[in-house]
Amino acid sequence: MGRVIRAQRKGAGSVFKAHVKHRKGAAKLRHIDFAERHGYIKGIVKDIIHDPGRGTPLAKVVFRDPYRFKKRTELFIAAEGIHTGQFVFCGKKAQLNIGNVLPVGVMPEGTIICCLEEKPGDRGKLARASGNYATVISHNPETKKSRVKLPSGAKKVISSTNRAVVGVVAGGGRIDKPILKAGRAYHKYKVKRNCWPRVRGVAMNPVEHPFGGGNHQHIGKPSTIRRDVPAGRKVGLIAARRTGRLRGTKTVQEKEN
């Protein structure tokens, strides 16, 4: 019998978990409160920091607690163009400026946003990667819903009370620079997770992978595989509808609903 293959080992356990030792913390919007629902609250950007394992810079924003005599520090996804010492306003009546946090329903159509809430109060789930942004498409005041275009190009209908940061996520163009050497890839994935270097299946022995073995490196069987095979055999092109090159030209018309 063969060994437990890599795809099976990627489950419970510490081997493939993210390396979170030096992370700075979870980057989220403020908890929704009375000040944000009915007016605005002012904070100041104290620092812009790097978070290991994340390509996006983070902004340390300090707010006065509206209910206690103390200050609270929040970690925001930094929007491109913000700077230390800048005032950040969060709330329904805040101005539409870069870095401010507003409900989607009060933004004009065509506004560029990031760190968008998927559900009201979840503190930002969509368009958070470096250089990403979503676009406000339309509003429906009757149903209190808004339509946004996500970085993937998909369009999503969300509640108009969902909050978002105005602007584009900082750190855009990060992946344009080539890695060039293995040492940089080593350090990149050292702070992310144990997924590098990745050995090819055909380079393994037969006990370690279904594609392993042979006098030369070849798969030796169809690389397509059905959906319901056991986990130790499920490698290659899983339940592929088609394989090979996409030949010819095909025009796709985007439907506007």
Swiss-Prot record:
Pfam families: Ribosomal_L2, Ribosomal_L2_C
Protein's cellular compartments: Cytoplasm
UniProt keyword annotation of Cytoplasm present: yes
GO MF term list: rRNA binding; structural constituent of ribosome
GO CC annotation terms, alphabetical: cytosolic large ribosomal subunit
Main location (coarse class): cytoplasm
Record key words, sorted: Cytoplasm, Ribonucleoprotein, Ribosomal protein, RNA-binding, rRNA-binding
Keyword Ribonucleoprotein in record: yes
SMART domains: Ribosomal_L2, Ribosomal_L2_C
Biological-process GO terms, alphabetical: cytoplasmic translation
InterPro entries (UniProt xref): NA-bd_OB-fold (IPR012340), Rib_uL2_dom2 (IPR014722), Ribosomal_uL2 (IPR002171), Ribosomal_uL2_arc_euk (IPR023672), Ribosomal_uL2_C (IPR022669), Ribosomal_uL2_CS (IPR022671), Ribosomal_uL2_dom3 (IPR014726), Ribosomal_uL2_RNA-bd_dom (IPR022666)
Protein family (similarity comment): Belongs to the universal ribosomal protein uL2 family.
Function: Component of the large ribosomal subunit. The ribosome is a large ribonucleoprotein complex responsible for the synthesis of proteins in the cell.
Subunit (UniProt): Component of the large ribosomal subunit.
Protein name: Large ribosomal subunit protein uL2
Species this chain originates from: Ictalurus punctatus
Organism phylogeny: Eukaryota, Metazoa, Chordata, Craniata, Vertebrata
